[in-house]
Amino acid sequence: MTEFDTIAAISTPMGEGAIAIVRLSGDEAVEIADRLFRSPTGKQLKDVPSHTIHYGHIVDPKSGRIVEEVMVSVMRAPKTFTREDVVEINCHGGFVSVNRVLQLVLANGARLAEPGEFTKRAFLNGRIDLSQAEAVIDLIRAKTDRAMNVALQQMEGRLSKLIRELRQTILETLAHVEVNIDYPEYDDVEEMTPRLLKEKAEYVRGQIEKLLSTATQGKILREGLATVIIGRPNVGKSSLLNALAHENRAIVTDIPGTTRDVIEEYVNVRGVPLRLIDTAGIRETEDIVERIGVERSRQMLKKADLILLVLNYHEPLTEEDERLFAMTEGMDVIVIVNKTDLPQNIDIERVKELAAGRPIVATSLLCERGIDELEKAIADLFFGGELEAGDLTYVSNSRHIALLEQAKKAIEDALSGIDVGMPVDLVQIDLRRAWELLGEIVGDTVHESLIDQLFAQFCLGK
């Protein structure tokens, strides 16, 4: 275990609540807590068993004044999250009391933790690897049950296990090559022929490709689908956002141009997180404020993963409608024909022609009809209706995906070398490169600056 000083931070969100927790970790965690904790029975925390909780008060050692009534948990190394001694002081929720306790802890020998430092220590002390540490962030930020399940799988080490198995295969192959090169006279060691080397490399490439095949779905679950709602003014875009969000998030009126800016909302559609973006109606306008909103809408359109194009069932198609179809050509689009509670004036055959095989859903948002069909269309478009079975390991982190792509390229370079008859000692350079890249995923071959950058994304106290 690495030697560190003792750190402390508030581990619960600030604000009013039932409890707030000050967490300490390090060799002096119990000693510092003992300076402040007073039990009604007079017992000291250094004498209590590990993984126990105790009632008492936090007392200012200088004045002897009671600061807070608390429950204190004592957990001794190595069976803790950081593999260090950990103390958690459970205070009443609120701003004042928990900050008073934290200030006393800091005044008595602890240092204020940096963002993510508790998890960083868990990594540096070998409690978790880097991919598991990153999964902690994903778990905190998960917007749906399925996104949370993917994060939990990664925290449990499912991805780590696969990566380590691939690294071990490469390492054994490299060792075999080295033995053949250094000790060619050993007849009892199987020769690493180009055919055998190719089999090993192709196996590793196949496993990497299998992981990468989950990347699109994994990133959607982790980051959400950037879903932009577009359409002429007053076709029901804001009503659609409200319907999917199941609340009145956007203003709905009969006045065209009510939405003058971009409104964002996270919604859960059948386990798929959507970052739903309601845009200002795209049209030519003299209103300066609305014009700015329209320009922002155009910019959001370029970054969208999914576009919900809303039309008015009660009105004929216009040049603006047709222009929107042209703007979204080649993109993932679901066409929504809204206001079907009113008489039909739209040319549905022309809509089908413009949609060019893309899904069309009829809705009456006013009457709450068609929402289920729309949600199914979204799930069908990206996940074939349902996510894969729970035993599939998803790759959802952009850093992991990039490293897997690079490792695959290194393996392919090795295979190309084998095909052209390159000596095996040169082929192993590419194999070693793949081994190192895979090691960066779990943190075995990662630079310290990257570690600092990754853990800086965490909140204080985690």
From Swiss-Prot:
InterPro entries: G_TrmE, GTP-bd, GTP-bd_TrmE_N, GTPase_MnmE, MnmE_dom2, MnmE_helical, P-loop_NTPase, Small_GTP-bd
Main localization, broad class: cytoplasm
A GO biological-process term: tRNA methylation
Location(s), subcellular: Cytoplasm
Binding residues annotated for Mg(2+), in chain numbering: S238, T259
Binding site for K(+): N234, T253, I255, T258
GO CC, alphabetical: cytosol
EC number: 3.6.-.-
Pfam families xref list: MMR_HSR1, MnmE_helical, TrmE_N
GO molecular function, one term: GTP binding
Cofactor(s) of this protein: K(+)
Cofactor binding description: Binds 1 potassium ion per subunit.
Keyword tags: Cytoplasm, GTP-binding, Hydrolase, Magnesium, Metal-binding, Nucleotide-binding, Potassium, tRNA processing
Binding residue positions for GTP: 234-239, 253-259, 278-281
Xref: NCBIfam families: mnmE_trmE_thdF, PRK05291.1-3, small_GTP
Function: Exhibits a very high intrinsic GTPase hydrolysis rate. Involved in the addition of a carboxymethylaminomethyl (cmnm) group at the wobble position (U34) of certain tRNAs, forming tRNA-cmnm(5)s(2)U34.
Subunit composition and interactions: Homodimer. Heterotetramer of two MnmE and two MnmG subunits.
Protein name as catalogued: tRNA modification GTPase MnmE
Organism encoding this protein: Geobacillus thermodenitrificans (strain NG80-2)
Organism taxonomic ancestry: Bacteria, Bacillati, Bacillota, Bacilli, Bacillales
